[in-house]
């Protein structure tokens, strides 16, 4: 068996796939190279759906409950249901800060993020963090909470400067299809700064399709993992 063949037959872990959003029925062929996967929630409805899908799959799967920073303004109406889901879920999130779109105010996003951090620490469950144009604020809140539990930085896009800073906090960096983009040179270099035991992969299905598959639903870890693997050879 040559190196290319053995690489294609490796079992992968997909740490972030929104299977709730796929407009198709999934069969086992979609997961033939997957060892296990994580289905994140972004509000009460999608978190409940993540739980339902996770229990129906034959492949090993985990699910999370959370409220996305875009919808942080809905926290007051979803707080009670989220608290109940947090107890059942395997992970907390997707949460965090997105100062690129600001679909909720920064104050609403911070309140929502702190809410998730508190429960992650209280329940000792990993937390999935969305961090876009908010590196300093995210870093400061994690320092304030002294790392609530295992922290996964979802679809990491930070350059070498912020990769180095967050490494100090012993977080996990999850790399998505963005790493295949021509515009992601700094990210491709920053992957070299991540210890292999802190490096995760994700599809972010159905988003962030790798360049060779643009226009299709994103179901491929192979196209994401190949450039990542090359950076660690």
Please state what every model-predicted region is.
Residues 2-12, 17-28, 44-45, 74-76, ...:
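Divalent metal-binding pocket/active-site signature
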Residues 29-80:
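A metal-dependent hydrolase metal-coordination microenvironment
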Residues 50, 116, 224:
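Aromatic/hydrophobic pocket-lining residues that form π-stacking "cages" and hydrophobic walls in ligand
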Residues 170-182:
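His/Asp/Glu-enriched short active-site or ligand-binding loop at hydrolase and phosphoryl-transfer sites
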Residues 181-182, 200, 216:
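Flexible, gly/pro- and Lys/Arg-enriched active-site loops
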Residues 204:
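Conserved beta/loop motifs at nucleotide-recognition and modification sites
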Residues 222, 226-233:
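Single conserved hydrophobic/aromatic residue that forms the stacking wall/gate
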């Amino acid at each position: 068996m040559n190196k290319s063949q053995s690489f294609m037959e490796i079992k992968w872990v997909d740490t972030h796939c929104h299977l709730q959003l796929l407009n198709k029925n999934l069969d086992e062929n979609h997961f033939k190279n997957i060892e296990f996967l994580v289905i994140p929630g972004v509000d009460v409805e999608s978190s409940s759906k993540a739980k339902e899908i996770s229990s129906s799959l034959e492949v090993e799967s985990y699910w999370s409950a959370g409220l996305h920073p875009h919808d942080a303004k809905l926290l007051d109406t979803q707080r009670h249901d989220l608290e109940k889901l947090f107890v059942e879920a395997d992970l907390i999130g997707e949460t965090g800060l997105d100062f690129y779109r600001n679909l909720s105010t920064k104050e609403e996003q911070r309140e929502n993020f702190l809410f998730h951090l508190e429960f992650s620490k209280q329940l000792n469950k990993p937390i999935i963090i969305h961090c876009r144009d908010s590196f300093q604020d995210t870093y400061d809140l994690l320092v304030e909470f002294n790392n609530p539990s295992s922290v996964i930085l979802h679809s990491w896009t930070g350059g070498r400067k912020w990769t180095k800073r967050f490494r100090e906090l012993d977080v996990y960096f999850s790399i998505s299809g963005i790493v295949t983009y021509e515009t992601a040179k700094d990210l491709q270099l920053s992957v070299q700064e991540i210890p292999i035991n802190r490096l995760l992969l994700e599809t972010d299905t159905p988003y962030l399709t790798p360049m060779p598959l643009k226009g299709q639903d994103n179901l491929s870890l192979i196209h994401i993992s190949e450039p990542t693997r090359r950076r660690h050879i």
